[in-house]
Amino acid sequence: MLNYLKYMIRVPRKFILNWAISGGVYLLILPLAFANSSVESLLIDTQREAFRGMSENDTAMSLLGISDWDNVFTLEGMVTTYFLVPFVPLLIGTATIILLNKLGSKAEEDGTFEFVASLPMTRSTVYLSQAIITVLFGLFVTFAWTNIMFIPIATMELSQTLDYGPLMKATLQAALAGVSFGALGFALGAFTGKSSMAWAFGGGLMAFEYLTNSLSGTNDFFQWVDDLSLIHISEPTRPSSI
C-alpha cells in the first residue's frame, strides 16, 4: 500500500503543484484590494454600488446565500461569499475528478498499470489508498491557496484583516466539501462503468446542494439540508480595521 501511495503522489506532482501555486497567487488580489483606501474605492466600492440593484432582488440574494449585501464587499465577505463557498468546492471537486482520472490514464500510458496490478493489494486497499490521496490532495491545495492569500494580511497594513485560526477552520470545511463532491462523482461514474459520467454526477450533486441550500432559507421543506450541507461554510471572522 505504501508503494502505491508513493506512486499516486509521484505521478501527478506537477499537476498538484500547478493547482496549489497558481491558485494561491491569483487569490492575492483579494487582500491586495484592501491595500489602501484609493485601491479599495476603485476595486471594491465601485463594484458594490454598480451591482446594488441586485440586493433588492430577494430571489437572487437567496440563491447566492447573501443576507447582507454590504458585508459581501468586505475582506471577510470576499473570502467567504466569493471564494470559500462557491469556488473552492467547485474547483476542488473538478480537480479531484481530474486527478483520479489522471492516475488511471497515466498508469495505462506509461506502462505502470501492470505495476499497480501486480501489487499485493485487495480492491478495498486500492480504493482506500485513492481515498487517502484524494483527501490529502484537496486539503493541500486549498490550504496552499488560503495560506498564500494570507501573506499580505499578515505582512502588510491593510484596511481590513482576518484572523488566521477561523480562516483555517473555514478552509478545512470548504476543502472537505470539494473533495466529497469530486470523490462521490468519480465513484458513481466508476460504478456505471462510464468515467465521463463522473462529471455529470459530480456537477449534479453540487447543483443539488447549492439549490437546496438556497431554498432552505425561504422554504421550510428544505430546512433539513442546512444540517447536512457540505458547503455550509462558517465565516472566518468579522473584518476589523487597522
Language-model features: where?
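Secretory targeting signals
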Residues: 32, 128-181, 185-186, 190
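Transmembrane helix boundary and interhelical loop/hinge segments in multi-pass membrane proteins
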Residues: 97-117, 131
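Short helix-to-coil transition segments within interhelical loops
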Residues: 115-123, 237
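Residue-level detector of conserved catalytic or cofactor/ligand-binding positions
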Residues: 232-242
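Long, hydrophobic alpha-helical segments
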Residues: 80-105
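Hydrophobic/aromatic residues in alpha-helical transmembrane segments
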Residues: 96-100, 112, 148, 183-184, ...
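Terminal transmembrane helical anchor/hairpin motif
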Residues: 4, 11-12, 24, 29-77, ...
